[in-house]
């Protein structure tokens, strides 16, 4: 039997998503497998992450799947994309998005300028290994991590203030998934600071190197502030565009564009 699923394809600075309203999904779907199928770039729609959303009385719930079918706890670019989609479909400008227990306050200033208040970050969580353990691991694999800091933005990130070539970023990103360091994996950010801007590349757990990462931008901005490398406001620079970042009363606010690519129908065999 073949069923039809309405979808929207969007991207935030090249970080792309397939977005589906939960009401269009049958309860019989294996969502993890559906995510893998739709995310496949040759036989599916193609995306970095698969997003399901559901409207409630005063907020929208967002569920995030990686291309390997695993779940993710946060995605800043997907949040901006979902906020824009809701704005286009309903006209709402102030939108609350819930991802698990994380509340994200969104404002659509205009179609190309969406801000997301992601709240506070933490530099002291149980999942974070000691600095000595990270350095010991780095030396074993001959990885030059230079200035490194862990940050929790609702999902786990490690920020490496070091310039590495893409092939080396891939190696480091994969090796830092070692269970002895990060039991559930970690998002790895490669940050280079120039003139109060952070030039950022991100290796996302469950996805690999992506063109942009909103939560990585937030975590790297917070880490840069903590280390004194930058001041607020600042700019995060990705290959296909920038995000403006600022800190207000301990909260991190991300601002940038989101792009609607297509609306369509996906045909699914059950």
UniProtKB/Swiss-Prot annotation:
InterPro entries cross-referenced by the UniProt entry: DAP_epimerase_AS (IPR018510), DAP_epimerase_DapF (IPR001653)
Instruction: Spell out the residues of the site Could be important to modulate the pK values of the two catalytic cysteine residues.
Output: 157, 204
* Molecular function terms from GO: diaminopimelate epimerase activity
What Gene3D superfamilies does this protein's entry cite?
A: Diaminopimelate Epimerase, Chain A, domain 1 (3.10.310.10)
Q: What NCBIfam families is this protein classified in?
A: DapF
Q: Which family does the record claim for this protein?
A: Belongs to the diaminopimelate epimerase family.
Question: Could you tell me what this protein is called?
Answer: Diaminopimelate epimerase
Source organism per UniProt:
Rickettsia peacockii (strain Rustic)
Q: Which gene encodes it?
A: dapF
């Amino acid at each position: 039997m073949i069923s039809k699923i309405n979808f929207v394809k969007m991207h935030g600075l090249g970080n792309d998503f397939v977005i589906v309203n939960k009401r269009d999904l049958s309860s019989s779907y294996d969502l993890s497998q559906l995510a893998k199928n739709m995310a496949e770039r040759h036989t599916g729609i193609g995306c970095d992450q698969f997003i399901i959303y559901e409207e409630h009385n005063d907020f929208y719930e967002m569920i995030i799947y990686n291309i390997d079918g695993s779940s993710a706890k946060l995605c800043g670019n997907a949040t901006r994309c979902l906020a824009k989609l809701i704005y286009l479909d309903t006209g709402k400008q102030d939108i609350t998005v819930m991802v698990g227990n994380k509340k994200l306050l969104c404002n659509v200033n205009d179609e190309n300028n969406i801000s997301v208040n992601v709240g506070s970050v933490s530099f002291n969580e149980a999942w974070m290994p000691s600095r000595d353990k990270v350095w010991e691991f780095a030396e074993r694999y001959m990885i030059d991590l230079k200035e490194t800091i862990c940050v929790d933005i609702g999902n786990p990130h490690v920020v490496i203030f070091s310039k590495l070539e893409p092939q080396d970023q891939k190696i480091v990103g994969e090796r830092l998934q070692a269970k002895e360091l990060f039991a559930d994996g970690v998002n790895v950010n490669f940050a280079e600071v120039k003139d109060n801007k952070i030039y950022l590349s991100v290796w996302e757990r469950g996805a690999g190197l992506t063109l942009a990462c909103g939560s990585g931008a937030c975590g790297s901005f917070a880490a840069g502030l903590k280390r004194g490398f930058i001041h607020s406001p600042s700019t995060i620079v990705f290959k296909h565009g920038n995000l403006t970042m600022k800190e207000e009363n301990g909260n991190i606010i991300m601002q940038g564009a989101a792009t609607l690519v297509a609306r369509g129908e996906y045909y699914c065999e059950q």
